[in-house]
Amino acid sequence: MVLCFPLLLLLLVLWGPVCLLHAWPKHLTRAHWFEIQHIQPSPLQCNRAMSGINNYTQHCKHQNTFLHDSFQNVAAVCDLLSIICKNRQHNCHQSSKPVNMTDCRLTSGKYPQCRYSAAAQYKFFIVACDPPQKGDPPYKLVPVHLDSIL
């Protein structure tokens, strides 16, 4: 039993950062958190845009992509044919046309002084969609995760 404790402690230490990466503020629905993280109809400078996300999580997010489109248009992608997500779930959907987007990558700093570089892109995207939660827009499915950029 003595040997199990250090191993358990190591697993907890390693699992902690993984949990932070996938957590969202519990007072928000997954769709609202998706909107905060990924929907930006008018491009903003990455340092400014990312501070809004980082203030929720209290750490510098390493990378984030902003889709320059409306939530309504991105939610409409959820009505397209389902495809397999990276996590092997079957609730992903690919956009039918490319959209403008900005990829923000952490270059330096520690929270709250996070600094980012920006790369403008025009690409297709894949989102995971789920039924709406209470408080979400009344769509059949809503985007909850940006699965990939193509």
From Swiss-Prot:
Location(s), subcellular: Secreted; Lysosome; Cytoplasmic granule
Which sites are catalytic?
Answer: H38 (proton acceptor), H145 (proton donor)
**Whose protein is this, by species?**
Macaca mulatta (Rhesus macaque)
Q: Which residues form the signal peptide?
A: 1-23
- What is the name of the protein in this document? Ribonuclease K6
For binding substrate, which residues are annotated in this chain's numbering?
K61, H62, Q63, N64, T65, K86, R105
Q: A GO BP term, please?
A: innate immune response
Summarize the protein's role.
Ribonuclease which shows a preference for the pyrimidines uridine and cytosine. Has potent antibacterial activity against a range of Gram-positive and Gram-negative bacteria, including P.aeruginosa, A.baumanii, M.luteus, S.aureus, E.faecalis, E.faecium, S.saprophyticus and E.coli. Causes loss of bacterial membrane integrity, and also promotes agglutination of Gram-negative bacteria. Probably contributes to urinary tract sterility. Bactericidal activity is independent of RNase activity.
Question: Which CDD domains does its entry note?
Answer: RNase_A_canonical
Superkingdom of this entry's organism?
A: Eukaryota
Gene3D superfamilies per the UniProt record, alphabetical: Ribonuclease A-like domain
EC number per UniProt: 3.1.27.-
Q: Which UniProt keywords apply?
A: Antibiotic, Antimicrobial, Disulfide bond, Endonuclease, Glycoprotein, Hydrolase, Lysosome, Nuclease, Secreted, Signal
Record: glycosylation sites: N55, N100
The record's annotation in PANTHER family points to:
RIBONUCLEASE, RIBONUCLEASE K6
Task: Please name the gene that encodes this protein.
Answer: RNASE6
Site for Facilitates cleavage of polynucleotide substrates, residues: H59
What SMART domains does UniProt report for this protein, alphabetically?
Answer: RNAse_Pc
